[in-house]
Regions:
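N-terminal leader/linker segments that precede catalytic domains of diphosphate-processing enzymes
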Residues: 1-288
Length: 288
């Protein structure tokens, strides 16, 4: 008798690639996952995580700017769902990197008003202690700046993985008056890196990068400024990308669209399309 295969359900998630100007180009903020976490242990990733029920609640919607464009390039996603993905992106970036994409009561970026940074730091601690995000935002008279997020990618975990995510990736620029820092709960380090440097460190075996993170860094690598990167993100198509899974000999591999084992997806191109898992780390290998 053939046993039915159960595919784990998808959990909606948001990820933010936070960038800032650097000499001759840009840097991106990455966090190192703790060794004991259930997903992507020890890997360097962008801040992000699963959507919470409160991300789609009406009270948080009333505290958002930029609602008119949240569905842009999100396909069949409904308005409320699209807003929730954006709210989750802002919340997760705040929790994991200490960066709040919001306007203060004067309509300026949070951080530009006296007392803002102290409120941001205390609010982050309160959020970690269980204070509802909407309650915190409303009390400080902040407005979440959903329009500062630009969608650029949509990644879906392969069917075979035990924990699967339907993740939208957003690009954002670090507000000038704020400084990113890792949270210390799910992550053990936070670092700004040039995309090319992160790729080089991964090739050298110094850090671990999951295939979607690697691919994003390769996409950001050519840009000479944050303006160029944001212009690209605003204009790029956002196809649904679900990597393939298999084995090459006894080695576990993941393939991306365009690999010999996986059909191309219009609007998606990657410099590397095949990754092997060796010693707990993914590394790009030649496609067969």
């Amino acid at each position: 008798m053939t046993r039915a295969v159960t595919i784990p359900p998808l959990a909606p998630a948001s990820t933010v690639a936070l960038i800032r100007p650097a000499a001759g180009g840009l840097e991106v903020f990455m966090v190192k996952r703790h060794t004991a976490v259930a997903v992507l242990a020890s890997a360097y990733v962008f801040p992000g995580g699963q959507l919470a029920l409160a991300d789609s609640a009406g009270d948080i919607a009333a505290l958002c700017d930029g609602l008119s464009g949240v569905r842009d390039r999100m396909g069949s996603v409904l308005d409320d769902e699209a807003r929730a993905f954006h709210v989750a992106a802002v919340r997760e970036l705040y929790e994991e990197a200490g960066i709040l994409l919001a306007r203060n009561r004067d309509g300026k970026a949070v951080g530009e008003r006296s007392g803002d940074i102290d409120a941001v730091d205390k609010g982050r601690d309160a959020l970690a202690a269980g204070r509802p995000f909407a309650t915190l935002v409303a009390a400080e008279r902040w407005r979440l700046a959903l329009d500062w997020l630009t969608l650029f990618a949509h990644w879906v975990t392969p069917d075979i993985e035990p924990r699967r995510f339907d993740a939208y990736f957003f690009l954002a620029v670090e507000p000038e008056a704020q400084d990113a820092s890792h949270c210390g709960r799910e992550t053990s380090a936070g670092v700004w890196m040039r995309p090319a440097d992160a790729i080089a460190r991964c090739r050298a075996g110094e850090i671990a990068l999951p295939p979607p993170t690697w691919t994003t860094l390769r996409q950001l690598e050519p840009f000479g400024s944050v303006d160029e990167a944001m212009a690209w993100a605003r204009s790029t198509t956002v196809p649904r990308i679900q990597p393939g899974f298999g084995f090459q000999g006894t080695t576990r591999i993941v393939t991306l669209p365009g690999d010999s084992a996986l059909a191309p997806v219009p609007g998606f191109a990657a410099k590397e399309t095949r990754f092997a898992l060796e010693n707990g780390r993914w590394r790009p290998i030649e496609s067969l």
